[in-house]
Amino acid sequence: MLGELILTEETDRYDAPFEGSRCGTCRSCIDNCPTGAVAPDRTIDTGRCISCRTIEREQPVQTALPGWLVGCDACQSLCPWNRRAPQHRNAAFDAVFDPLAMDAATWLGMDEAAFEALCGRTPLTRSGLTRIRENALRNAAPEEPSER
């Protein structure tokens, strides 16, 4: 499970938790993870996971991840089961802005008040503006040659 939703209000619909796996022989998440963070047993190596490395404050980031500012979710978007899931019908879950339309310079020039106004109701507050700026600076810098 990558997420959980906790509600403060009653809802008239609940579904039963799914026990088991629908993955079968599918390896889409394993084969397409940009950093190889999804192991064959479908566990996640958090040290390699782009989402963990760009979002979690406790996760140190030493190397650049060119093109990645916050999060990834390639494993989720490539999952055939997730692709078939019904879209939500609740406006409260609609995106409040398009983060893909923002470049690194926008994030670097933003102050805390602007960040709170734009992102205060989004999961981006989890990483915070400081972490997003660090990611923008690191990922804009030329990547150092690998020591292999």
Regions from the PLM with identified roles:
Residues 52-53, 79, 83-112:
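Conserved Radical SAM active-site core
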